[in-house]
Amino acid sequence: MMTQSIGRSMLTVMATLPLLFSSATLHAQANSVQQQLEALEKSSGGRLGVALINTADNSQILYRADERFAMCSTSKVMAAAAVLKQSESDKHLLNQRVEIKKSDLVNYNPIAEKHVNGTMTLAELGAAALQYSDNTAMNKLIAHLGGPDKVTAFARSLGDETFRLDRTEPTLNTAIPGDPRDTTTPLAMAQTLKNLTLGKALAETQRAQLVTWLKGNTTGSASIRAGLPKSWVVGDKTGSGDYGTTNDIAVIWPENHAPLVLVTYFTQPEQKAESRRDILAAAAKIVTHGF
């Protein structure tokens, strides 16, 4: 639980700090980050999960990073990546057209609704899902793959034993406290996002496409991005659901520094609670200070 996560976090935060500092200074700085995250969480009235990976040395900053949180639309990254993986062996796959019917529309379809009685390519569906969080696009990607369990199977193929997708949009966003469906942990998601965008989980062309989609996201300006210097390049995917669940996962390219991978998950005790993107921005500012 939290004690284990904080203890683990303190060790990994310390690993990111310059070796010239005394151990006392290292401990003080690690404590400061943890105390700031704990204070932020306490003031919010919710539960906050954070995982940051510094790819310069693979050190980590973790807070409740091994606890499960509902992914909501951050799960769209896994579905889109699974389709990209298929395209490695079928160079024409992303041009495959998918019919869009009025009956396909769900609660949020800013792109798909413009194509009712027409078609969209799998590439267009991937872009709509990741850059506009289009729920019909996500459902079409899931259907193409063969169901939510196939998205989970793709995660397993990457070595991610934590991710699980059980439902489609919009029911995957219920975010009921204690419900394991459609959840992961901040650390598991951070490790997988790193593998997908900066590692070898995808071939170079597919990896570049995923990064391009994430950099073009239109929904994240008030979340992680809001807590970072404007000169930093960010690719991210947001998510939100019941219980005020507010999420963002990002790959960050600071100036003159190796990329950072950051996952921020937040949820609240009341089902009708409002989203709190400001909490994600504040968490991002805390954990990236000094980079």
UniProtKB/Swiss-Prot annotation:
Residues 1-28 form the signal peptide. Substrate binds at K237, T238, G239. The class A beta-lactamase family has a specific amino-acid numbering system, sometimes called Ambler or ABL numbering and often misspelt as Amber. A multiple sequence alignment was used to derive a consensus sequence and then the consensus was numbered taking into account insertions and deletions. This allows use of identical numbers, e.g. for active site residues, despite differences in protein length. UniProt always uses natural numbering of residues, hence there appear to be differences in numbering between this entry and some papers. It comes from Escherichia coli. Is probably capable of hydrolyzing cephalosporins such as ceftriaxone and ceftazidime, thus conferring resistance to these antibiotics. It comes from the Bacteria. One of its GO terms (molecular function) is beta-lactamase activity. One of its GO terms (biological process) is response to antibiotic. SUPFAM superfamilies: beta-lactamase/transpeptidase-like. It catalyses: a beta-lactam + H2O = a substituted beta-amino acid. Belongs to the class-A beta-lactamase family. Keywords: Antibiotic resistance, Hydrolase, Signal. The gene is bla. Gene3D superfamilies: DD-peptidase/beta-lactamase superfamily. The active site is at S73 (acyl-ester intermediate). This is Beta-lactamase CTX-M-97. Its EC number is 3.5.2.6.
